[in-house]
């Protein structure tokens, strides 16, 4: 029988989940498990918009969100969207219906800027947006209008009023009484502040901006979990540090191809993500320092070493993966506490044991899969 971690041993406050590289590292999966571990009463988005896809696999089916944070999936927690996040009302309501979320469980800040159909059309017409691997969600165009103070706000739209609430007040109240999760978007390498030139997203996505985007009190932070993908990937163009990339043929041969949610506009087929052959340690060091990482979640370890596929015990991790963990800890100064080893939501090896996963959580996940 595996040891489980007791939420009573996890002090109340804020857990922030951020990605070290260019996204697609499994933030949503890690957020969902930390929400379960800490018995989080709220899961919040604090930056970005409806473009960045967060998802997990359950019984071979893919469960994803674009607008909502994914961390609520295994808990009955409240779902919140802070003023730092752009909201597409159509996607918001579609996800509420799909996940059977009643209006009293979803809260958005009155100051959230709203994505319009014109924002989406503007991005679709942009050759630059196609080149950098944009999801064409309209988030960038919406945020540009926000800077110009011309974007519509949630408080101005009548049908959104049942969902509108002051998110800073709500988040800080919940963090004082228990635990909450703040879920970032994309990754450090795509930060508008710290990424590479024009090959970035429309906002900053680091710990500081997620915190500000929710309006949460920094004194309530208990942990910052930095998600480190064993073999980092990137959508579209832009540098990936001083590390050689796999060719598509090499990825196919090794069975480590990752298909994107972004499709080729001409063929309609999913793009294949670019994949580095290792970690650029200078980038990881910067990501750790700027985000203030207190612990590390290592993801996609099975792409680094197939021998650990679906391993769920720390003692079963291979020397190759354990050596990678040592190097990551040496560079970041933070412990690796969890290793993701496969596609399934529970392909995880916890250093201190596994959070208890009961029939309640399993039934909840199962309810999200269409019959």
Where are these regions (language model features)?
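Non-transmembrane, aqueous-exposed alpha-helical and coiled segments at domain scale
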Residues: 2-371
